[in-house]
């Protein structure tokens, strides 16, 4: 090291020499031809926008589907419970139908069963459970299950002439079909 470097510190650092880049003068694109890079960028932007719009639409559709699924889950949550109550309702109705005596004890029993049945029907209505009792109606395979066919007699062909067991709907969804006898032609 030289004495000057020791007293003054190292000398000024050498500056890098500027690089000389040969640049061609920018040529203006001919008036009739658009810049290829600009067209590609616009096309890419258009494709990206299209993807974005499709993704937004897909998300909105998914949100709507999920909302509908949640609504249906709430609406039909009672389905299993309601199906379990149907035999209880049937038994009450049969018990009332069987209690035809005039004895005071039978009358009290019948009255209690009728009040219980009335409460059941009220609860069913409250929760959207409707009775399907198609006696005299046209046979509907979506709500009725034909157990037998009988000669028509006075009834019109393909109408329900007897109901073995009532059917039930939960918010217009079939819980149990009505078991019926249908008039033959």
Curated annotation (Swiss-Prot):
Keywords attached to this entry: Chaperone, Cytoplasm, Stress response
MF-aspect GO terms: adenyl-nucleotide exchange factor activity; protein homodimerization activity; protein-folding chaperone binding; unfolded protein binding
GO biological process assignments: protein folding
Signal peptide: none
Pfam families assigned to the protein according to its UniProt record, in alphabetical order: GrpE (PF01025)
Subcellular location: Cytoplasm
GO cellular component terms, semicolon-separated: cytosol
Region (Disordered): 1-44
Function: Participates actively in the response to hyperosmotic and heat shock by preventing the aggregation of stress-denatured proteins, in association with DnaK and GrpE. It is the nucleotide exchange factor for DnaK and may function as a thermosensor. Unfolded proteins bind initially to DnaJ; upon interaction with the DnaJ-bound protein, DnaK hydrolyzes its bound ATP, resulting in the formation of a stable complex. GrpE releases ADP from DnaK; ATP binding to DnaK triggers the release of the substrate protein, thus completing the reaction cycle.
Subunit structure: Homodimer.
Family: Belongs to the GrpE family.
Annotated protein name in UniProt: Protein GrpE
Natural source organism: Methylococcus capsulatus (strain ATCC 33009 / NCIMB 11132 / Bath)
The organism's taxonomic lineage, starting at the top: Bacteria, Pseudomonadati, Pseudomonadota, Gammaproteobacteria, Methylococcales
């Amino acid at each position: 090291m030289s004495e000057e470097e020791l007293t003054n510190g190292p000398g000024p650092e050498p500056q890098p020499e500027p690089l000389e880049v040969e640049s061609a003068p920018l040529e203006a694109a001919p008036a009739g031809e658009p810049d290829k890079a600009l067209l590609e960028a616009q096309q890419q932007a258009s494709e990206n926008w299209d993807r974005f719009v499709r993704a937004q639409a897909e998300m909105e559709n998914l949100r709507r589907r999920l909302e509908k699924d949640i609504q249906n889950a709430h609406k039909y949550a009672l389905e299993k419970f309601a199906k379990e109550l149907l035999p209880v309702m049937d038994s009450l109705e049969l018990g009332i139908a069987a209690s035809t005596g005039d004895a005071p004890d039978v009358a009290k029993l019948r009255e209690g069963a009728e009040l219980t049945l009335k409460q059941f029907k009220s609860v069913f209505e409250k929760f959207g459970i409707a009775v399907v009792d198609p006696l005299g109606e046209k046979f509907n395979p979506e709500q009725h299950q034909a157990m037998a066919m009988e000669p028509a007699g006075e009834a019109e062909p393909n109408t329900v002439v007897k109901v073995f067991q009532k059917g039930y709907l939960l918010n217009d969804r079939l819980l149990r079909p009505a078991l019926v006898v249908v008039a033959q032609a």
